[in-house]
Amino acid sequence: PSIDTVRPDARVHVFLDETTATLYLDTSGESLFKRGWRFDKGEAPLRENLAAGLLALSGWQPHIPLFDPFCGSGTILIEAAMISLNIPPGINRPFAFERLRNHDSRRWQDMLDKSRLHIKPALEAPIVGIDLDPQAIDAALSNADRSGLDPTCLDFAVGDAVSTPPPSEPGFIVTNPPY
């Protein structure tokens, strides 16, 4: 049979130890932290799942204003907007199981459509990010656009964290500071 070794229909992993061989069928494909929207990265990119984890650990809730004074390519704020709007992570990315022979594409599409019914139309509170680097802000805007978010949903601007006050009070600051 003809097999595409770069992008096979099914990827099988074999793990061996002294007495056992374990076979795994890869149903995810790309790593799950890859949500399918972040192509533009800053100097110190933060994985999308780590950004979502930081937000969860911070105690931030969608009804509370959020500010990132070192937003870079916007990962934390885009994840926050997606959480706030109830957009499932990875809803727009392909998965490896979609190429499997017994995949029911109609059922999968029905599940995606049902999950989209729960997406909220607007944020409950402002989500604002600034960065000194205009290229980082351009990257954040591009990433937000690719994520499917309404461009007016997030407020990205070039600014200096030292001289720019948070846009509203009270609120949360969640950031990945430069080092």
Where are these regions (language model features)?
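Amphipathic alpha-helical repeat scaffolds
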Residues: 143, 173-179
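A short acidic, Gly/Pro-enriched loop at the edge of an enzyme's catalytic core
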Residues: 162-174
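Short, well-ordered loop/turn elements at secondary-structure boundaries
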Residues: 7-9, 17-18, 61-63, 123-124, ...
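Conserved active-site beta-strand-loop modules that form the wall/rim of enzyme catalytic pockets
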Residues: 21-23, 74, 171-172
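Residues immediately flanking
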Residues: 18, 161, 177
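Non-catalytic, mostly N-terminal accessory regions of nucleic-acid modification and defense proteins
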Residues: 1-55
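Residue-level signal for inorganic ion chemistry
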Residues: 14, 140, 176
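Conserved S-adenosyl-L-methionine
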Residues: 46-165
